[in-house]
């Protein structure tokens, strides 16, 4: 390990959800006052691997990368600090050091605000350190106010943890119980993000629509009220929130999609299965008809809203009839975008010990069938945008010279040829071509905002 004074370069590798991306940015913010600047892995004196534990091969991916970093560290005579952060760190703790003794630090998802102290402890004691505690004080309260600009589209964590305990999911064990940040702290961070150039803010949480935070006057706000307060921030043009649970989609939040003009007409609402029997075994505590009702109420409140979702196929005990129910829900609902996965066992979760695991070949066939329908729906949704005009938030140059790229209200990448549009600009465009994963557009004369 090198001395603190000489270790001032940093690389953070991030796997997993948008919350992990947010956490990685905040880790960089925590370390910036110590003089750390971000560089490529091969040039870094400290490497942080911010891990995800959702998929089956998460640990294998981690230890493969740790093997590569071990060789790099040894080539420098040990002059590199290696840290494992995030959900695998939280779940496996000391096991990481047992399998990879060249790791210097294992820091859980609730402790990264303590990075300066942990680094100092490593330097003082000349040994590896583990911190996977769930402290009573929320980490958000202890993070520095100064943070790097995220650009025109920014993410803001307002809630963390999960109390739902779905039988397939590790999040309650790696992120802890549901905790909501106070509204005042969220509003203050949002204003800082806007001052730093953000035009769109996406609110983050494992169950973001479960947020019920303390208001400035000591009362409790729900997410709909928070969105209304955020909409009053000058310079903020767009709002989103993710990820939601159907059980927490209340009437006030559905009404917000009708009443809040800054709330974008796109919602990610995971359902996982269309079978009531499988939803019960997943401990989702809702049925497929609740999801159908919510989708209908959202579309009644905001006719132009588009939905995305998550699906798991091959969950233990899933029959052909159960899978057919999922396919029926998909066809009836229609999704602009969806993420689908084969069920994978997560150690320590109830479903991992179920006796009626599904054969991998059956999982593969079901996933292929589901993804074909979801892909067709996404392509159809994109094709339906051709000829429409709407605002695009431009974020920077496109992949080819002379292009400008941005995001539609539905999160689709939109590209305009022969345009040099500054990042952060909202312009009305007309969609002229659809691709499977993006849209091509031409500019109209009206500029919505600059």
From Swiss-Prot:
Keyword Flavoprotein in record: no
Single GO molecular function: N6-isopentenyladenosine methylthiotransferase activity
Catalytic activity: N(6)-dimethylallyladenosine(37) in tRNA + (sulfur carrier)-SH + AH2 + 2 S-adenosyl-L-methionine = 2-methylsulfanyl-N(6)-dimethylallyladenosine(37) in tRNA + (sulfur carrier)-H + 5'-deoxyadenosine + L-methionine + A + S-adenosyl-L-homocysteine + 2 H(+)
Alphabetical UniProt keywords: 4Fe-4S, Cytoplasm, Iron, Iron-sulfur, Metal-binding, S-adenosyl-L-methionine, Transferase, tRNA processing
Binding sites annotated in the UniProt record for [4Fe-4S] cluster 1: 17, 52, 87
Any matching Pfam family: TRAM
MTTase N-terminal domain ranges (all copies): 8-124
Cofactor info, note text: Binds 2 [4Fe-4S] clusters. One cluster is coordinated with 3 cysteines and an exchangeable S-adenosyl-L-methionine.
This enzyme's EC code(s): 2.8.4.3
Domain of life: Bacteria
Listed Gene3D superfamilies: Methylthiotransferase, N-terminal domain (3.40.50.12160), tm_1862 like domain (3.80.30.20)
Domain Radical SAM core: 148-380
Subcellular location: Cytoplasm
Domain TRAM: 383-445
GO CC terms: cytosol
Function field: Catalyzes the methylthiolation of N6-(dimethylallyl)adenosine (i(6)A), leading to the formation of 2-methylthio-N6-(dimethylallyl)adenosine (ms(2)i(6)A) at position 37 in tRNAs that read codons beginning with uridine.
UniProt similarity note: Belongs to the methylthiotransferase family. MiaB subfamily.
The protein's name in its UniProt record: tRNA-2-methylthio-N(6)-dimethylallyladenosine synthase
Record lineage: Bacteria, Pseudomonadati, Pseudomonadota, Alphaproteobacteria, Acetobacterales
Name of encoding gene: miaB
